[in-house]
Swiss-Prot record:
This is Glutamine synthetase. The lineage of its organism: Archaea, Thermoproteota, Thermoprotei, Sulfolobales, Sulfolobaceae. PANTHER family: GLUTAMINE SYNTHETASE, LENGSIN. Residues 15-99 form the GS beta-grasp domain. It catalyses: L-glutamate + NH4(+) + ATP = L-glutamine + ADP + phosphate + H(+). It comes from Saccharolobus solfataricus (strain ATCC 35092 / DSM 1617 / JCM 11322 / P2). Pfam families: Gln-synt_C, Gln-synt_N. Transmembrane segments: none annotated. Belongs to the glutamine synthetase family. The keyword Transferase does not apply. Keywords: ATP-binding, Cytoplasm, Ligase, Nucleotide-binding, Phosphoprotein. Its main location: cytoplasm.
Amino acid sequence: MPSTAEDVLKFLKENNIKWVDLQFTDVPGRLHHITIPADEFDLESLKTGFGKLDGSSIRGFTSIYESDMVLLPVPETMTLIPWSPGVARVLCKVFWGGGKGRFERDPRFIAEEAEKYQTEQGYTSYYGPELEFFMFDKVKLDVSAPQSGTGYKIYAREAPWSDSGTFVIRFKEGYYPAPPVDQLMDVRVEIVDTLVKYFGYTIEATHHEVATAGQGEIDFRFSTLVDTADKVQTLKYVAKNIAAKHGLVVTFMPKPIYGDNGTGMHTHLSLWTKDGKKNLMYDPNDEYAEISQFGRYVIGGLLTHARALSAIVSPTVNSYRRLIPGFEAPVYIAWSKGNRSAVIRVPAYYRGMEKAKRIEYRPPDPSTNPYLAFAALLMAALDGVNKKIDPGDPVDENIYHLTPEKRRQLGIKELPRSLNEALDELESDKEFLKPVFNSSILDTYIDLKRDEARSLQGYPHPMELYYYLDS
């Protein structure tokens, strides 16, 4: 991939590129694009950027009276778009118009600031998200006249309600079935092939997940904060486009199906010395999980701020339909070795492997903005390190099966049960974010999410009529 402006121009010429997609991310986390002629690219434009953006039309960006904005390509993200011959794409940084500098609510800017902050503190960090998703044949929505009622119907060839006449996957029985029961393996493989060949990924695994109706997962090799966030956005973009080519619909919403597992983005995290030579999470003399005291402080910070983090890593009303007991989703704020009923799991596959020592933070889902999510996780972790926050003892039991009294005795709290509750927590616990998250991004994010929650609260749910029509 290109690394300089000169490389970009060479890449465009050698690949006979006619059009370039300028892509950027809004505050909630949606990817946007504008397509421009490749012949607009020259050394000057790659230095000054492209004045192509009306920021007043992008959620969380600007008002109509200050709407002119500039997109500056990031050369190392320039790649071919394999399903669009003659077209390339590049991720962009967002700047104010008029030479006023970097736009402070650009999510990628927040992630870049987080990386700078950790470097100043003497650390580097690595992230390994596990992206789950559903792949449906079709989704029908009925929302055109919400006053008369709303509804939806999911069509999925693997689902128990399917009339496809082929194998179905029962609820909660979708983990690792071999083909032909796993009917969508070939599409997942095409997605990861595309990521490897055109976008430079190292893929660790792809497989069917626990839920029915085409739930899958893709795991790629861990990387640094900004690069991993770029990769999350790119993976979602590629998966949706490859699926669409096959007439399928990929969704990363956390809980599209009642009664089955939701979609998460469990995130593996480790902190190292700034030069990347020593894993600070690792202690070979720790008998419990080879986790160092430094690593325990990281855990302490994440647990302390877990309720506030929920507003960022579980950012939609739908997220809290996933975060309920009984569906392998984290609910209880505790940590443990190899325990998937806790918010934080210390993977325990091997011993004596410094490079592999990490923690897994389980609450995130892929509806999050990855730039903000990874930056927030880092800030919570560093707060734990700087304040030496002890996480307490690990809980080596199935926390779902503990009585409320037992959980109280162990001091185990719960994650928020709604987006509004999570936003309340973020408003009361955001000081740890402020070295990186400016007040503009925090206030804008909270306002956007309050509006989202308020809007959805106004719609009667179809099941409410089932339960209450005879009141």
